[in-house]
From Swiss-Prot:
Protein name: Protein SEY1 homolog
A Pfam family annotated for this UniProt entry: RHD3_GTPase
UniProt gene name: SEY1
Binding site for GTP: G41, S42, Q43, S44, S45, G46, K47, S48
Single GO BP term: endoplasmic reticulum membrane fusion
Length: 889
């Protein structure tokens, strides 16, 4: 294992592998439990040899046999873990304490002839670097050089003290640096160590301190405020080697038990030591002002960011695994399990991992970076929260649509036409909710059809209110699930609330789309039933055409139907149309976004109602719902956020949809436009009915002709054989004129209010009129010829004209043949058909001239005759079997 490494080379470049070296030697996780010693002194003064004996290091030493030369170039770093030593008895007992490792910095010797005149720059930099890092600076000097300037390191001491003041003058809590003077080749016989120490302190340190140019605030400060001065004498390493080794061992124990700080005095955690060295050296080389507190802050920022990134990297793996699991299988349990998992497995675990190392650095920076860590974790956790909330919103949106569909399924299944009641549902109830509902007695008395109709009308009249309440309940459930996702950060004593707005926007949009879809579907059902009702009121238009005698009568009657329909629809269905279609100029002008989210908040403390001002911005009318669909979604989202605020504040949500509907009911312009819409629908159905009548014009003309031509004033069938030819022609002319009067009626050559705005005079095309007239003329002429034929031949064909004696002679002469045929018929079992034939003859005599009745009788007789043959065959077979059985007996 490489127990030493060069951190700064001869050219003054800092090496980049210090961190890896510390990690390999298990020095990066010591926290503050380590120390740093640097040694300064003249070149070839035995610094590396002293360190090797004192701390069991392996720095390169000079081979004197090869001559004096520079051995240590730049700065080298090694360590001693003191595994063979202990810190001695503890205060509480005889147990020994483990000794913190010490990093040993071997600095290139000063006064080097190899560097020449450039040595001062490197010496100053290395001294500054050593003082910035070391708890203890060893000043290595020879005893016999104490009176010299260069050899005694007087200049080096001055540099050390100036640099130390430069470094720590701004730090009120600056750590004291241990200045350990190792006096080499010292003999007790020369002078005691106390005299040597006094000489060093008085003639060197105090003198230098007095002569130094100090800032005003340090003028009266004693040198002891910055340094702890220790002097140790070491015997000659060659002449008295055993004593030298003994002195070194004593110094080792003194370091372990007395001089060594319990923790690194520079307050740099070991994991940031390499980066701190890099920053310090680069600042020194750039000849910038070396500000130790700023350097510590820079290091704290760097290390806290580095620790934060490592923690985030570890947490990201856990979050990704959870995200993959939650994406593959969504359920309500995943939402319930999220909060404890996120709090313990992600947030608390990450904070604990972060503070293990980061807490050693500047507190303010550590805490600030921990907030950044939390923010980063929350951003990643937001993805899982979004997944959970998106699952929730999909379930809730589907539930909303299903419940609303189920609520209105009865309306979609009922296809009956409306049986309008006289009571109007436009009345506003005193409770402000609008609408009217039948009393219990009325419900018992109404029929099933009317009961179903009333139920549908009540549902349609409160569609927006029901949807609003259902939407609010949906948002309450959404917010309940959202609150399960919020995380409590116990170490911060706060709760983090995730962003729910994207999921709420999706939910609001889905609700709005489903609401409009169901609303449009119900509007279609309402329109279909309304049109069917209108059509049923116009079903007698054809019958009226057959009996009406002038255009004024026909169109006045039609106008009464139109007005009655308009009034009935307005009285019974206006609230339905306001809810499903909207009031105003165009479809959807009363939109879901404009009314549904319009709610208020009751404050439980003062019971006062606070109306949201946003509502006023969403009551405007629109001519095209499709063109503003996106705007409606935006409005829906904004107002649903308002509902969430109501839920957050635990207030009472009071829907004002009923009040908005009532305002529309009282709005004369809105009602007028709805009435215009009703009239448009009524007239569309009327036009369709008139088009249908136009297509069947010939049939109606013929029916009008038959109603006069075939029946007299008493509505009895005419007996053409009793009517003369002149009278027949007169009846034909009157019937024809009456029949073709329908054309003048349909062409509406009269002034009729309301209807004139939709149907112009002569609205039936001439081609259709001519085609119907021609077809009707042919049929009328055919009917007239039939009447003439009956008139001419009816009397001759009558059996009443045959003389009585003819029947007597026929009976006498045909008696035998009559008996023969009678026996024959009974033998063949065809007596029933004969009776049927007789019935035909009889009916002919009775209903002579009534062609329709005769036709019906003939068809009935033919059917009975056709089916009676098989019956008699079966009876004949049964009779034959019975005869055979009797013969056998």
């Amino acid at each position: 294992m490489d127990t030493k490494t060069q951190i700064i080379d001869y050219d003054g470049n800092i090496m980049e592998d210090l961190k890896e070296w510390m990690i390999r030697n298990k020095l990066a996780n010591l926290g503050f439990n380590y120390n740093v010693i640097a040694i300064l002194g003249s070149q070839s003064s035995g610094k590396s040899t002293l360190l090797n004996n004192l701390f069991k290091t392996s720095f390169d030493v000079m081979n004197t046999k090869l001559g004096h030369s520079q051995t240590t170039q730049g700065l080298w770093l090694s360590f001693d873990t003191f595994e063979d030593s202990s810190a001695g008895p503890s205060e509480q007992g005889s147990t020994t304490r483990k000794v913190n490792p010490t990093l040993i910095l071997d600095v290139e010797g000063n006064d080097s002839k190899e560097r020449g005149d450039n040595r001062l720059t490197f010496e100053h930099r290395s001294a500054l670097f050593s003082l910035a890092l070391a708890d203890c600076v060893i000043v290595n000097l020879w005893y016999h050089s104490l009176g010299n300037f260069t050899a005694s390191n007087y200049g080096l001491l001055k540099t050390v003290m100036e640099v130390n003041l430069e470094l720590f003058q701004q730090d009120e809590n600056c750590p004291k640096t241990i200045l350990l003077f190792t006096v080499r080749d010292w003999f007790e016989e020369f002078a005691s160590i106390d005299i040597v120490k006094n000489k060093i302190v008085e003639e060197y340190l105090n003198k230098i301190w007095t002569e130094m140019k100090k800032p005003p605030e340090a003028e009266k400060v004693n040198i002891s405020n910055y340094f702890i001065v220790e002097v140790v004498g070491l015997s000659h390493g060659i002449i008295k080697k055993e004593e030298f080794l003994k002195d070194v061992e004593n110094l080792r124990q003194k370091w372990i038990n007395q001089l060594r700080p319990l923790q690194y005095s520079r307050n740099i955690p070991s994991d940031g030591f390499a980066h701190y060295c890099n920053n310090i050296w680069n600042t020194i080389v750039k000849q910038s002002q070396l500000d130790i507190p700023s350097q510590k802050e820079m290091l704290a920022t760097f290390r806290c960011q580095e620790i934060k990134n490592n923690v985030i990297s570890n947490a990201s793996k856990v979050i990704k695994e959870k995200l993959a699991a939650s994406s593959s299988q969504h359920s309500s349990t995943s939402i319930d399990e999220f909060k404890p998992w996120a709090e313990k497995e992600v947030v608390e675990k990450s904070l604990d991992e972060y503070f293990v190392d980061a807490s050693r650095y500047t507190e303010s920076i550590c805490l600030k970076t921990s907030e950044e860590l939390l923010d980063s974790l929350f951003i990643q956790l937001q993805t899982i929260v979004d997944n959970n909330l998106n699952f929730t919103q999909r379930v809730l949106a589907a539930k909303f649509a299903n419940e609303l569909n189920t609520m209105y399924s009865v309306c979609a299944s009922d296809k009956n036409v409306f049986l309008f009641s006289k009571e109007s549902n436009l009345q506003v109830r005193k409770d402000g909710k609008g609408g009217s509902s039948p009393s219990a007695g009325d419900k018992k008395d109404t029929k099933d059809t009317r009961s179903s109709q009333d139920k549908c009308i009540r549902l349609w009249s409160s569609f927006l209110l029901n949807a609003d309440k259902l939407e609010y309940n949906t948002l309450c459930k959404f917010f309940e699930d959202y609150q399960k996702c919020n995380i409590e950060v116990k170490k911060r004593n706060k709760t983090h609330e995730f962003n729910y707005k994207p999921s709420l926007s999706i939910l609001s949009t889905a609700i709005c789309k489903d609401l409009n879809r169901i609303r449009n579907a119900q509007l279609t059902v309402l329109l279909d039933r309304t049109r069917a009702t209108i059509k049923s009121r116009f079903k007698n238009m054809e019958s009226l055409l057959i009996t009406t005698k002038n255009p004024e009568e026909y169109w006045n009657h039609t106008l009464k139907i139109v007005k009655a329909l308009q009034e009935s629809i307005n009285s019974n269905l206006t609230k339905c149309f306001i809810n499903l279609k909207g009031g105003g100029a165009g479809p959807g002008s009363i939109t879901t976004a404009g009314i549904i989210p319009n709610g208020g908040l009751y404050n439980d403390e003062d019971n006062t109602f606070h109306e949201d001002n946003l509502v006023e911005a969403h009551n405007s009318l629109s001519d095209n719902q499709t063109g503003h669909e996106n705007d409606h979604y935006v409005e829906e989202n904004l107002l649903n956020f308002h509902k969430i605020d109501v839920i957050k504040n635990k207030g009472k949500y009071i829907s004002t949809v009923g009040e908005e509907i009532d305002k529309q009911v009282k709005n004369k312009n809105a009602i007028a436009e709805l009435n215009s819409y009703y009239l448009d629908e009524i007239m569309d159905v009327l036009k369709s009915k008139l088009d249908e009548i136009s297509d069947n014009l010939s049939s109606i003309i013929i029916q009008r002709f038959e109603s006069v031509f075939n029946y007299d004033d008493a509505e009895q069938p005419r007996q053409w054989r009793e009517i003369s030819m002149a009278e027949l022609k007169k009846i034909f002319r009157e019937s024809k004129n009456y029949a073709f009067l329908i054309i003048d009626i349909l062409q509406k050559n009269v002034q009729v209010e309301i209807i004139d705005d939709y149907l112009p005079n002569n609205f039936i095309k001439d081609e259709i009129v001519e085609k119907g007239k021609n077809k009707a003329k042919r049929k009328i002429q055919e009917m007239c010829r039939d009447a003439q034929y009956i008139q001419e031949t009816g009397a001759k064909m009558s059996l009443k004209n045959v003389p009585l004696f003819f029947w007597v002679i026929l009976l006498i002469l045909g008696w035998n043949e009559l008996l023969f045929f009678t026996r024959f018929f009974f033998r063949l079992n065809i007596i029933l058909p004969l009776f049927l034939a007789a019935a035909v003859i009889l009916s002919t005599l009775v209903f002579n001239g009534n062609m329709e009745v005769l036709s019906i009788i003939n068809k009935a007789v033919f059917f009975l005759a056709k089916n009676s043959f098989g019956v008699y065959r079966q009876l004949q077979a049964m009779g034959g079997k019975a005869a055979q059985g009797a013969a056998a007996d």
